[in-house]
Structure formats: C-alpha cells, structure tokens
Amino acid sequence: MRQYLDLCQRIVNEGCWIENKRTGKRCLTVINADLTYDVANNRFPIITTRKSYWKAAIAEFLGYIRGYDNAADFRKLGAKTWDANANENQVWLNNPHRKGTDDMGRVYGVQGRAWRKPNGETVDQLRKIVNNLSRGIDDRGEILTFLNPGEFDLGCLRPCMYNHTFSLLGDTLYLTSYQRSCDVPLGLNFNQIQVFTFLALMAQITGKKAGQAYHKIVNAHIYEDQLELMRDVQLKREPFPSPKLEINPDIKTLEDLETWVTMDDFNVVGYQCHEPIKYPFSV
C-alpha cells in the first residue's frame, strides 16, 4: 500500500503535464515506476485509502484467462470494465471490424489464448506456459503477451498491461509484468490485484510455490480531472494494514479456471478501508 501512495505522491510532486490526444485531457505524468508484491507471504496489495472493488479486478483477469472478447461475458463474471471501451469509444464504433454491441475485438485474452500465425493457425500462449511450468520447465521464454501491433485495428483498445513473464527458481515461481500506460487513481489498483492474483493462481495450478511479483510501469499518470481528489483527499488518508487473499484450493488446473471458477472462489480477509472516492474515467 505504501509504495502505491509513494508513486501517487511522486506524480503530484514531480509529474509533467502531457496532453493526451485520445481522451482530449491533460495528464500529470512520470516515467518508470517499479512495484513489488509479496505473494509468498500473501500481502495482498489492495488500496485501503479508498474502497477497492477487488472482485471486479479478479473477474476481469479471469475473463482474459478465458480469452473473452465480449463485454457481456465480462459482466457475467462481475466486471463492467469493458462496457465503455466496447460501446462508447467513437473510433471503435466507427471501425468496420466491430461486430456489434459489446464486441471488444482481438484484445487482451484473445491474443493470449489465440494469437494468429501467418498460416491462419493460432497459438495458445497461456497453455504452453502452464504445461511447461507444471513439468518444472522454464525455457526463459515463459511469456504471455497481449501486445500485437499487427492487430491493433482489430480491437477497441491497445493493451495497457501487455506482458507477463514467469520465471522458475527451483520450485518457486516469480512473475514480472510490464505495463506501457497506467491511470494511477483508477487503473493501478486493479492492475496490482491482477498481477498478485495471476502469480498466486499460476503457482497453485502448476504445483509451485509463489515468490515475488514485479510490476513495471512505463507511463504512470493522473488525469487533470482526478488530481484534486488524489492530492486533497486520498493522499491525506492513513492506510490500513494489508489484508490476505484466499483462493479456493480446489482450483487445480487451467481447465478449472476456464470452466467453473467464479468470484465466490476468492475471498479477502481483514480488509479495512476508507470511504469510496469516485474518480472520473476517461474513454
């Protein structure tokens, strides 16, 4: 929690104003942020200086694991995070590749589970990683990437957190996640939860011990219409201790994650937080 607040304070103190053409807003921006999450000791990195809707964050990433490409499927899991980008992004609404209401196109999990090869076949990146790690194999290329520049025009949004690299040291599994762009007041807590939970789940289904998760952000920013709430409200609050994440131990395979797992299989224990803060969201 403290490293999150330190990053927020750094942006407020040192950030540079940059105009964002996609949203038409200015962003207070810093370059390069490194965060570390202690998955081994289950120090769940959830925001406590405002209420965090952690179930939606996990639901969204579960949708990526399943390769979903439709906002309606994410809503069924408990995440409304794709409603706006699928249905209110004017560039995407005008895109001839859009298939209709709630269609997201070839983004995130679609790339992770069905990356297109030149011959028309697809690559299931996640399946390969799970298979290798389950056998104790780390080929130094256990990489899940959502970034496919050749298909940017086939999706409603380029991936922000775009790369997840797994590493094995003995029987301990580590994760390094890379993010090109981060809306810190709104998006970062989702991303923190997702990085932490992804490592915890992958360790569980491959029979490994979870180590540390490393989260590397290139462009970390606060939008101009978020700044006052961050500076004058959230940063004035004292954080509470980190809670713990409980995951149903019956989740043992990738197939489990693909089929029957719901948000009822996750629980956060000991979560204390301040009142919610409604930050503006930029499409």
Swiss-Prot record:
One of its GO terms (cellular component) is cytosol. GO terms for molecular function: thymidylate synthase activity. The active site is at C160. Keywords: Cytoplasm, Methyltransferase, Nucleotide biosynthesis, Transferase. It catalyses: dUMP + (6R)-5,10-methylene-5,6,7,8-tetrahydrofolate = 7,8-dihydrofolate + dTMP. (6R)-5,10-methylene-5,6,7,8-tetrahydrofolate binds at D183, S282. Its EC number is 2.1.1.45. It is found in: Cytoplasm. Pfam families: Thymidylat_synt. DUMP binds at R22, R180, S181, C182, D183, N191, H221, I222, Y223. Pathway: Pyrimidine metabolism; dTTP biosynthesis. CDD domains: TS_Pyrimidine_HMase. It is an enzyme of class 2 (transferase). SUPFAM superfamilies: Thymidylate synthase/dCMP hydroxymethylase. GO terms for biological process: dTMP biosynthetic process; dTTP biosynthetic process; methylation. Belongs to the thymidylate synthase family. Bacterial-type ThyA subfamily. Homodimer. Catalyzes the reductive methylation of 2'-deoxyuridine-5'-monophosphate (dUMP) to 2'-deoxythymidine-5'-monophosphate (dTMP) while utilizing 5,10-methylenetetrahydrofolate (mTHF) as the methyl donor and reductant in the reaction, yielding dihydrofolate (DHF) as a by-product. This enzymatic reaction provides an intracellular de novo source of dTMP, an essential precursor for DNA biosynthesis. This is Thymidylate synthase. It comes from Mannheimia succiniciproducens (strain KCTC 0769BP / MBEL55E).
